[in-house]
Amino acid sequence: MKKKLAYIGLASLLLSFTACESSDNEFSDFDYQTVYFANQYGLRTIELGEDEFLDNSLDNQHKVSIKAAWGGGYTNRKNVIIDTQVDESLCENLYFKGSNTPVTPMPTSYYTLAANQINIPKGEVIGGVEVQFTDAFFADKKTLDNYYVIPLKMTGVQGADSILQGKA
């Protein structure tokens, strides 16, 4: 019996030195690639000063970045350009969840968009457009609450098949 256990143990030990080779899994991309705003949440806090946990250097320049995402594949092989425009009609008859507060387009005097396009570089899946806030933004107390949004809309795309759309 002890001999059998020794042989089984020896066989197990020898088998452990033989291994299968693991190669990288390669999957094909989905049938089409899309772009979309990945996070549509009405509150973005701008934190001025130093933060030991997060890089808030953009905040300290009185800026934020509105991000777009690319999906439908494992690797973005193209430079993707998304055309955008501010569309205040997106806010019509829209209220913040759990309140009677209407979603109000931010006055255009409160900010400047760096461009009317969002670029997602080849090899990346996220890109953004910077928003520079003016002194008027910081002077308005309503900016401290869920009140204003920048109703940015994707209007066209080059380098991807379509803009992913849904209902609010």
Where are these regions (language model features)?
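Sec-dependent signal peptide recognition
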Residues: 3-10
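Short Pro-Gly-centered flexible turn/kink motifs
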Residues: 120-132
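Intrinsically disordered, low-complexity sequence elements enriched in Ser/Thr/Gly/Pro
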Residues: 1-2, 42
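Conserved interaction-surface patches within small, structured recognition/assembly domains
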Residues: 114-120
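Acidic/polar, low-complexity intrinsically disordered N-terminal segments immediately downstream
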Residues: 21-109, 113, 124-127, 137-138, ...
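C-terminal motif of bacterial Sec signal peptides marking the signal peptidase cleavage site
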Residues: 16-19
